[in-house]
Amino acid sequence: MGLFGKTQEKPPKDLINEWSLKIRKEMRVIDRQIRDIQREEEKVKRSIKDAAKKGQKDVCIILAKEMIQSKRAINKLYASKAQMNSVLLSMKNQLSVLRVAGALQKSTEVMKAMQSLVKIPEIQATMRDLSKEMMKAGIIEEMLEDTLEGMDDEEEMEEAAEAEVDKILFEITAGALGKAPSKVTDLPDPVAIGATAAPEEESEEEEEIEEMQSRLAALRS
């Protein structure tokens, strides 16, 4: 505390170092999230192979769609890491500017990156706090909430889903299910692939699928 109870402003260099540390910490959070989703993906792949052997094409399609959503979530997380690296690089540049000009400068690059990063649920709270600190320091301007973000995700998912489902099933089952140009409606007869599951087994499998879907949804949210 300074005189009359006022908090003294931190030197710009200290602010930049603090921001860089926080960003690196959040990058590790993103890395863990990616690894967790990838581990669940491996379980889904095994479940698809098992379901394919039993001729359960509906189960395979459901799980393949989960794989698609997970891959998209991972791609978004990797994109976030790239943006965070961009901010870190800009912070280094700010230190160079500070040494020459004695003050921090506005950065449109940091502004754009932070606008995207505040929308990532895993790191949202930290990125919002950092944005406020950067606005106060004069590096970025006040950001407006983008309420339109993500509105087209479901439509895009539906348009691309069928082709992607075929591709994933073809790859995971080594060609037993799914075909590059055609849809998964021409799957082999279940009897030809494997024995039909008993009602008890089907109930257990449904529970396992629901649990798997819940875990993946939790990791992606």
Swiss-Prot record:
Q: Which InterPro entries match?
A: Snf7_fam
Q: Where is this site: Interaction with STAMBP?
A: R215
| Region described as Interaction with STAMBP: spans on this chain | 202-206, 220-221
Where is the short sequence motif MIT-interacting motif located?
200-210
Which GO CC terms are listed, alphabetically? cytosol; ESCRT III complex; late endosome membrane; multivesicular body
Q: What is its main location?
A: cytoplasm
* Pfam families, alphabetized: Snf7
Per UniProt, subcellular location reads as: Cytoplasm, Cytosol; Membrane; Endosome; Late endosome membrane
Membrane topology qualifier: Lipid-anchor
Coiled coil residues, start to end = 22-54, 144-221
Q: Map out region (Important for autoinhibitory function) in residue numbers.
A: 59-64, 168-169
Q: Where is the lipid attached (N-myristoyl glycine)?
A: G2
Keywords tagged on the record: Coiled coil, Cytoplasm, Endosome, Lipoprotein, Membrane, Myristate, Protein transport, Transport
One annotated GO biological process = late endosome to vacuole transport
Acidic residues bias locations: 199-211
Assembly and binders? Probable core component of the endosomal sorting required for transport complex III (ESCRT-III). ESCRT-III components are thought to multimerize to form a flat lattice on the perimeter membrane of the endosome. Several assembly forms of ESCRT-III may exist that interact and act sequentially.
Role description: Probable core component of the endosomal sorting required for transport complex III (ESCRT-III) which is involved in multivesicular bodies (MVBs) formation and sorting of endosomal cargo proteins into MVBs. MVBs contain intraluminal vesicles (ILVs) that are generated by invagination and scission from the limiting membrane of the endosome and mostly are delivered to lysosomes enabling degradation of membrane proteins, such as stimulated growth factor receptors, lysosomal enzymes and lipids. Involved in late stages of cytokinesis. Plays a role in endosomal sorting/trafficking of EGF receptor.
UniProt family annotation: Belongs to the SNF7 family.
Protein's name according to its UniProt entry? Charged multivesicular body protein 3
Which classification does the entry list for the species? Eukaryota, Metazoa, Chordata, Craniata, Vertebrata
